[in-house]
Amino acid sequence: MNAPAAFESFLLLDDKKIYIEKDTKVPNAAIFTINKEDHTLGNMLKIQLLKDPEVLFAGYKNPHPLEHKILLRVQTTNATTPADALTTAITDLVGELSLLEHRIDSAIKKCTQSTDTERGYN
């Protein structure tokens, strides 16, 4: 079979997680190659980047279904760099995901408490 071994989808081995390449076709742009990631992270980063008013363009692609990497292209205004915009987007995503985790934990706790009360455990 032509498919790579399953472990190749998540083990970095001696490879770097991210490579940055300046995009010479457009001003103030870069292409980030993020290894061992897929559409989940690519779409989250793209959406978060597009919320930033300093980001003019953000898009990603997976070059091939059997390659476990994404190419994220970012173009910004002169007020910031693509790397800074990506760092800000990642920081904002971590905050949003932490808030989501907290809300889920609270909802589970509330549901468990109400179920325990209904069953007479409290």
UniProtKB/Swiss-Prot annotation:
What family does this chain come from, according to its entry? Belongs to the archaeal Rpo11/eukaryotic RPB11/RPC19 RNA polymerase subunit family.
Any idea which GO molecular function terms this record carries? Answer: DNA binding; DNA-directed RNA polymerase activity; protein dimerization activity
Chief localization: nucleus
Summarize the subunit comment: Component of the RNA polymerase II (Pol II) complex consisting of 12 subunits.
Compartment(s): Nucleus
**Listed GO biological process terms:** transcription by RNA polymerase II
Keyword tRNA-binding assigned to the entry: answer is no
Q: Which GO terms describe its cellular component?
A: RNA polymerase II, core complex
Q: Which UniProt keywords apply?
A: DNA-directed RNA polymerase, Nucleus, Transcription
Show which residues constitute the signal peptide.
none
Report the Pfam families cross-referenced here.
RNA_pol_L_2
Q: Which CDD domains match?
A: RNAP_II_RPB11
Please indicate if the UniProt record lists Transferase as a keyword. no
InterPro entries on file: RBP11, RBP11-like, RBP11-like_dimer, RNA_pol_Rpb11_13-16kDa_CS, Rpo11-like
Looking up PROSITE patterns in the UniProt record yields: RNA_POL_L_13KD
State the protein's purpose.
Answer: DNA-dependent RNA polymerase catalyzes the transcription of DNA into RNA using the four ribonucleoside triphosphates as substrates. Component of RNA polymerase II which synthesizes mRNA precursors and many functional non-coding RNAs. Pol II is the central component of the basal RNA polymerase II transcription machinery. It is composed of mobile elements that move relative to each other. RPB11 is part of the core element with the central large cleft.
Return the protein name.
Answer: Probable DNA-directed RNA polymerase II subunit RPB11
